[in-house]
Amino acid sequence: MTTSVCRRAPAIFVNHGAGPLPVLMPVTDPDHGTARAFLEQVTPAWLGLNDVDTRPSAIVLVTAHWEESTVAISSGASHPLLYDYGGFPKEAYALTYNAKGSPAIAHKIHALLTAQNIPSKLDPTRGWDHGLFVPMKLINPAEDIPIVQLSVVRGSDPDLHFRIGEALAPLRDENIAILGSGMSYHSFHGRGNLVAQSKAFNDALVKACAHVDVQARGEALRAWEAMPGARECHPREEHLIPLHVIAGAAGHDALTSKDILSTMFEPVRLVSMGWGVQEL
């Protein structure tokens, strides 16, 4: 008789790229290829998708592209796609991603948040936005892992979002991975040396996230606005705040980070982070 051991699934923050372009452009594209390569090659390895013994049983994905007054949780057995972008080729509006939802996990998330006095609501109808389906088409094109999508909360309070992550952390012990989809740099009006600017901010982010002690990590991330170039890199922080959720869910795990040069708008450095990941 064998005993089944439930793996502790990882917590990962990824840069989802510019709209649908990581999916539409080839990996050799000079502007979008690096983002695509990370999502297509590194993230599946971090998640352990290539081995039945390390694959997560489900994924909870926090998207920068859904903001609500309280945490909203996709609770349907399936969800349509929400093409929440404009001005792209017609192929961008024919993309599909047919992974299942999980009402059971959605209700479990609602209960975990309620236990920590964090208001939340179930949403069985809203479509999955491109913060989910663009990276997931590259991360897991097999579409065979159930997903529950979570919103961020308007106002982007760093303390609240870190606490949301802490509340979700027990899911990892049930082999449910927690994925944050945003950008470590997100500004359309950058000035000056953006590579140096984004690298300085990313380095400060990594230093904050590298704290193994979860309390120290939380304190460092709550002060993100004091990091070098913070507001230049994030005039609005909705693309950063999923990282706070993931860092809160990371517990006392050690950090793995990977930085890439992206030229999707202007040349900038982007950093993705993972805790409890499968090493390459």
Predicted regions and their residues:
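A short aromatic-anchored loop/beta-hairpin motif
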Residues: 2-116, 120
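Surface-exposed, charge/polar-rich loops and edge strands
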Residues: 4, 108-111, 115, 146, ...
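Solvent-exposed alpha-helices and their adjacent loops that cap or buttress functional pockets
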Residues: 4-5, 52-53, 139-143, 170
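Beta-strand elements within well-structured catalytic alpha/beta cores of enzymes
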Residues: 10-15, 58-63, 150, 171-184, ...
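Short, basic/glycine-rich phosphate-binding loops at helix/coil junctions
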Residues: 13, 84-89, 141-148, 222
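Long, well-ordered alpha-helical scaffolding segments within enzyme catalytic domains
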Residues: 37-45, 159-174
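Flexible, glycine/proline-enriched loop segments at strand-loop-helix junctions
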Residues: 92-100, 151-158, 230
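Internal, conserved structured core segments that host functional sites
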Residues: 105-162
